[in-house]
Amino acid sequence: MTRRLLMVLVLATALVVGGCGNKEKTTTEASTEGIYLDVGGLKYQVQISRILNPSDIEDRNYLTQLPQGTLPPKADEAWFGVWIRVQNTNDGKSLPTASNFEIRDTQDNVFRPYAQVGNVFAYQPVDKLGPQEVLPNPDAPAGFGPIQGSLILFKLTNTSLANRPLEFRIISPTDPTNVGTVDLDV
C-alpha cells in the first residue's frame, strides 16, 4: 500500500511541476540567425544576412531608393543586408515596430542603416502592428519572395566584416533598455 501511495504522490508532483512550465521564455539574445527575439512585445527574426553585390541583378533591386547624395561603397566598403521578419503574437494589442537598429563589430565600431523609403523590399517601421500580424505583409514583395523578410541596409567596412562576429542590435521603440541582439552569419 505504501508503495502504491508513493507512486501516486510522485505522479501527482510531476503533474503539478509540469503544469508550472507553461510560460514562454523571453529571448533577447541569439548566437545565430533564425532565432526569435522578444523586443518591445514583438518577435523579431533575422531571416538572412549577407553582402550585397551591386552588379548582381537581384541585388540591384535591394539597392534602390537610397537617400539623395548616398555614395556607393568605397574600395574598402561593402553593402550589407539584414532581412528581418516581425510578428505580433498578442491577441488584442497593436504595438509599434522598432526603428532603431545597429551593427557592432568586435572592435565596437557601430554602423547604422540607410533609410530606403519607397523600396518594396526595405523594412519600414509601423506605428501599430496589429494583433497576430506579420511584417512584411505576406502579400507584399518582401513577404512572398524567397527570403520572406524586409531588408535593413548597411554600409560596412571590409575590416569590420573581418572583425566577427557582427552583432545586430534591435532597440525597442518603447524602452531603449530593451535590446535584442543576434550574432550574424557572415
Predicted regions span which residues?
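Conserved functional micro-motifs across diverse proteins
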Residues: C20-V186
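Sec-dependent bacterial lipoprotein signal peptides
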Residues: M1-G18
